[in-house]
Regions:
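Predominantly soluble domains enriched in secretory-pathway, periplasmic, or organellar proteins
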Residues: 1-365
């Protein structure tokens, strides 16, 4: 059932919504997804991310050059253009107005700020648009230039920091202690480590071809990086800021999600279309399940009992039980679901459909 279809009229909301919670009643693995909202408008969402304080951000790439912000009820709060004056942020080599291309978002632990990666930058002093088939050498030959991460103040909903990272940054994550921002640079084959206190990149860690998903341990000691151009996950020590290891997970790992207690890592495998469960005590895959063609993003319920996976070419979302990775439900979406988030305020699941929709599913008893 569809409750309503939203247009683009802004409304107001408070960023001091209730704290994240586990919904009362049955656990998430005893609930089922029901479509309740379809949000349209001038959007082309690559990703969608809930703040868990009552806001949801959709990143609309270079197709719209915006980030659209909604409240947990699905009302549009603000459309944030990706335009900045780079000179005002301390980058005099890029005069005039610069556009970004918002890809993914990551909130600080208190949700006071959200960091947004930009696929490429468009303006004076920047090279050509990046590509998904680049390599460090081909990017250098083409004259590609580093991209930037924006920080957005979730109270004012305005960009207040611009941070240089690598070539075609995609995923990013903030450590639970709020100290580090970790960014995967797709074309640089490395990861940027940013000190959030100074908004400065302090390390670039080589990890392998096409790094994508990132998860960080609950104690903020270790970052896990999915190497989509391979079959492994790389570990980075967040004290030494160095690569410390690697373990096999399967072909083309894309998204990483960690269990609330940090015991297990869940991985989407883009090529095989499988979701796998890794025991982090042994770094071994202990379960896997096929969910659909061209598996992309994944989210986890607050109680840690369920996963939600989008299957890009199957046009579906699959819900899995984390204990045994069995399929609980598969629901249809629009064409090319690509992003997904779990809103801990409502227990709803939001799906970004690349062709121009956000779908909201209630996880109902």
């Amino acid at each position: 059932m569809i409750r309503r279809v939203h247009g683009t009229t802004p409304t107001t909301t408070s960023t001091t919504s209730p704290f994240a919670r586990i919904p009362t009643g049955p656990s998430s693995n005893q609930r089922h997804l029901v479509l309740i909202d379809t949000i349209t408008g001038a959007i082309s969402p690559k990703s969608v991310d809930a703040s868990d304080t009552g806001l949801v951000f959709a990143q609309n790439m270079m197709y719209r050059h915006t980030v659209t912000v909604y409240d947990s009820s699905g009302n549009l709060v603000k459309t944030i253009p990706d335009t900045v004056d780079m000179t005002a942020f301390g980058f005099p080599g890029h005069p005039g107005i610069t556009h970004g291309a918002p890809v993914e978002a990551a909130f600080t632990p208190d949700a006071r700020y959200v960091y947004v990666s930009n696929y490429s930058m468009y303006g004076a002093g920047f090279g050509p648009e990046g590509s998904d088939t680049c390599t460090p050498s081909s990017a250098e030959a083409a004259g590609d230039t580093n991209s930037y991460v924006y920080r957005i103040d979730t109270r004012t909903l305005s960009i207040d920091q611009v941070i240089e990272v690598g070539l075609v940054p995609k995923y990013l994550a903030v450590s639970p202690d709020g100290k580090w921002l970790v960014v995967s640079n797709w074309c640089s084959f490395d990861v940027s480590i940013v000190d959030t206190a100074t908004a400065t990149q302090v390390a670039r860690v080589p990890v392998g071809a096409y790094p994508r998903g990132i998860a960080i341990s609950p104690n903020s000691s270790e970052a896990y990086i999915a190497i989509m151009g391979g079959d492994n996950v790389v570990t980075i020590d967040l004290q030494s800021l160095a690569k410390t290891g690697s373990f096999f997970v399967g072909e083309n790992p894309r998204q990483l999600v960690m269990s609330p207690d940090g015991s297990y890592l869940y991985v989407t495998l883009n090529g095989p279309g499988e979701a796998v469960k890794v025991d982090l005590a042994t770094d071994q895959v202990v379960a896997s399940t096929y969910t659909g063609e061209d598996e992309r993003s994944m989210a986890i319920a607050t109680d840690g009992q369920s996963l939600y996976v989008v299957n890009y070419l199957s046009d579906t979302v699959t819900k899995l039980r984390t204990s045994d990775m069995s399929i609980l439900q598969t629901v249809s979406t629009g064409v090319h679901p690509v992003g997904i988030t779990y809103d801990a305020i409502t227990g709803d699941v939001w799906v970004a459909v690349y062709t121009g929709q956000l779908l909201v599913f209630a996880d109902t008893p």
